Amino acid sequence: MATRNVATVFGGSGFIGRYIVKRLAHKGYVVRVAVRDTEAALFLKPMGAVGQVVPLHASVANEATVHRAVEGADLVVNTVGILAEQRPGDFRLIHAEGAGRVARLAAAAGVARLVHISAIGADPNAASRYAATKGEGEAQMRAAFSAVTILRPSLVFGPEDHLFNRFAAMARLSPVMPVICGDTKFQPVYVGDVADAVMAALSRPDAAGATYELGGPRVWQFRELLAYILKETGRRRRMMDVPMGLARVQARVMEMVPGKPLTRDQLLMLQTDNVVTPNTPGLQDLGVVPTPVELVVPLYLRRFQPGGGRRPLPSGDPSGRTTDLSYQTKD
């Protein structure tokens, strides 16, 4: 594939985006990494030849920067999303209006293919603002770019993930493991599989205009995931169920903490199963074999084991370069 073909990845320096950038560069695309902080995206440049991976300042909330990012692009991928609002209205600004803006300007620029990363549970009528605005974003995407491919992953895991790393760190410090909505079901999907699904969606004619739900090979209850984290980190901790009333009080307090580790909106999401809808197209329909949690997660949770502080974290650069080969995954 000629390197003159251009792909734009909004949020390309993020957890999922970096894996997509790597694959596009490997396929020979000139990759525009459209991000708010170009300095934070410089680590991606070695994924391609000189000048092939180009960090570009853009915000999905800004018309001019989105226009510049999609102009002349053959393919566009939107991975932008947030888990918590810093200001009221951020979910709608980013998930709904931002997604619609990307689709509208991509269509106007003559972009051939557009892939949008949404989330399982996206529904304009959802109680959670996160899920509702994700649903609104999907609707705006389809209205502006009818051939958009929408991918809805469940909980995404990988070396840079939020959930497994966060709770492993908590287990290292806390004598108990708090469990909120422990019976809620998740179908964790590997970040590399999500990126492979994006690449398949960009190249398959039958993916245009379709929606896929992405989940791994096993459905886990939330308490099972937490117990698995304790097992893989070698930590013996009491698992303590937290009543919803107390959880709401904790969330109200944590919303005022920098980084907002828990919000009331996240509690709403935790009360709904996050699994692939039966008979919905998924990874296998895109030719991707789902990767089990057990094949990848132990590799990057080793550092949380007793005495594991001396072990290096798997490289945040998904090119696979790391000083400790025992931590390499198939990516």
Regions found by a protein language model. Give the residues of each.
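N-terminal Rossmann NAD(P)H-binding glycine-rich loop of SDR-like oxidoreductase domains
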Residues: 2-30
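SDR active-site strand-loop-helix element
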Residues: 10, 34, 79-80, 114-120, ...
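Residues forming the Rossmann-fold NAD(P)(H) cofactor-binding site
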Residues: 17-19, 96, 135
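NAD(P)H-binding glycine-rich loop region in Rossmannoid oxidoreductase-like domains
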Residues: 38-101, 105-108, 120-124
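Alpha-helical membrane-targeting segments
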Residues: 43, 166-191, 231, 236-277
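Substrate-positioning beta->alpha
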Residues: 101, 162-163, 181-203, 210-213
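Conserved beta-loop-beta element that borders a ligand/cofactor-binding pocket
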Residues: 118, 138-162, 169
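Mid/C-terminal beta-alpha module of Rossmann-like enzyme folds, strongest
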Residues: 200-263, 277-331
